[in-house]
Structures are given as structure tokens and as C-alpha cells.
Amino acid sequence: MADVNDFLRNWGGRQEPTISEKIKNLFKSQQPLRYRLVMANYRLRTTISRLDVYISKLQERDRSLFEKVVESQISKDSARAAMYANEIAEIRKITKQLLTTEIALEQVQLRLETITEIGDIFTSLVPVIGVIRELRNVMKGVMPELSIELADLEEGLQEVVLEAGEFTGARVDFATSSPEARKILDEASAVAEQRMKEKFPSLPSFATSVDQKTNANQK
């Protein structure tokens, strides 16, 4: 097990490594742990900003289709109203997934900021990795490029934990999602549900009933 001085050097990157450490580090990332956490946080902010833009575009698309539903109702074109309502339902399903991801990543970002300040890697970073892994899987079918970004971020944070483990002798199981990770995701989903109600108006009852009848006939 490495000593405290080794950990401090790897955390802040201030001291010169020994010859043997230089050889060993040829196979590792050369940035100190703290620097890598700062960069991970920067990447998270960029991802969150992209999600926000994408959600805004979906909201605008939803608004446009909602107006067409109303227009179709006025003209008594129930088939067209149902078509627009179906598309709105799909847009809102995707939007809720993106909102949940955005909110959860905001929580992850806050956690990373705290970890960067206090250096509490094992008790705080492992649940974060679990959250990112779950979100990566969800995003595969929605935004594949975002899923790839999250996979890279997850891998980088796992390396931080594993390297920190060399100094503490601690072991971690990345395959098992922690209760805290599940709690973060559940809370994000609940907040996303509430925001959906605030951001998106309910479909007119006529369009909703037509939509349900259309789906029933398709079964």
C-alpha cells in the first residue's frame, strides 16, 4: 500500500515522482486525480448545456404540434388530431428521459465539486459512477452520442477511484448500483415529472380520447 505522501502527490500533482514511479506511470494517466475531477466536471457542464438546448428544441416542437392538434379539432379532423397527439406523446416521452438525465447530471456535478474540494473519493464518487452508468444505458436509445460521452466519463472516474484505491487499500464493486445512486435517479425522475407538468400543457380531452381509440384499433 502506498503512503500518505504518495496519495498527496497523486492528488495535487505537486511533488516529483521517483524513477520507479515514472516507469509505472507510463501506463497511467499523467494528470493528478484532482485535475481529472475538475476536467470531468467541465465535461459534465458541457453535456448539461447540450441537453438543455435539445430539451428546448423538443419543447418548441411540442408547442407547434399542440397548436396543430387544436386546429385539427376546430376543423373536426379527428384523424389528423390523433396523428399529432401521437407525435406529441412520443416527444414528451423522450423529453422526460432527457430531463431526468439532465437533473441527475446536475446532482452529479454538485457531488464532483464537493469531492474536488475535500478529496473524499471512495464514499462520494462511487455512487456518482453508478448514476452515470445508469444514464448511459438509458441514453443508448435516445441520444447514442451522449451515451458514448457518458461511457468515457464513467471510465475516467473509475480510473480515479482505482488509483485512489492503491493508496487506501480499499476495493470497490462497480458492477453493483448503490442505494444512493438509485436514490439520486429516483429523485431526478420525480423532479422531471413535475417539470413536465409545468412545461407542457395537457392535451385537449377530445384529442386524448381519439388517440386512445386509435391505439386500441391498432392492437
UniProtKB/Swiss-Prot annotation:
The UniProt entry, under InterPro entries, shows: Cell_Div_Machinery_Comp
> An example of a Gene Ontology BP annotation on this entry?
cell division
Q: What induces it?
A: Expression is highest in dividing cells.
Q: List the disulfide bonds.
A: none
Q: Which UniProt keywords apply?
A: Cell cycle, Cell division
Q: Which domain of life is it from?
A: Archaea
| Record flagged with keyword Oxidoreductase | no
Q: What happens when the gene is disrupted?
A: Deletion mutant forms small colonies on selective plates. Forms enlarged cells, with a highly elevated content of DNA.
Q: What does this protein do?
A: Part of a cell division machinery.
Supply the name of the protein: Cell division protein B2
Q: Which gene encodes it?
A: cdvB2
